[in-house]
Amino acid sequence: MDRYEAMEQRRAEVQAMLHPDGGQPLGGSGGSAGADLAPDVSDMMLTVIQGGVYGRPQLDIKTRAICTVAALIATDGGRYLENWIGNALNVGWSKEEIVEVISQLAFYCGVPNSVNAYGAAKAVFDARGL
């Protein structure tokens, strides 16, 4: 198995953890304009990120998910933030922990970004009945 094939295999494992219901991430299978317009590039990005970076042993998937949530809060990641809040819940973060991360970041990433993040979190929590 070559390196890219190994990353594709690890990507499938990561996807199973992040999306235990079999759902597709944003950016995969038509979930974003990029996936629609350049599916090969979208697929390659997901394989490298989730199969390469997420496959490294230094951090577990739970830690990587909350790091991604924090980065998306800091950069006002829009609909990707909702996706990753859902992923964080899927790998074991609680509603209360996610809200606390948003609160912590208000003072470092800006109140407007945190207000947007609270809205994204509420949408995810409401959709899941939390």
Predicted regions and their residues:
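Acidic, glycine/proline-rich low-complexity segments that act as flexible tails and inter-domain linkers
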Residues: M1-I61, V115-L130
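N-terminal alpha-helical segment
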Residues: L46, T63-I66, L81, I98
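Short, flexible active-site loop motifs that bind/organize anionic cofactors or intermediates
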Residues: Y54, A88, Q104
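Short, structured motif recognition centered on aromatic/hydrophobic residues
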Residues: R64-L72, I102
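A short structural micro-motif
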Residues: I73, V91, Q104-V111
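Extended intrinsically disordered, low-complexity coil regions enriched in Ser, Thr, Gly, Ala
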Residues: G77-E97, N113-V124
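Short, hydrophobic/aromatic alpha-helical segments in well-folded domains
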Residues: W84, V101-Q104
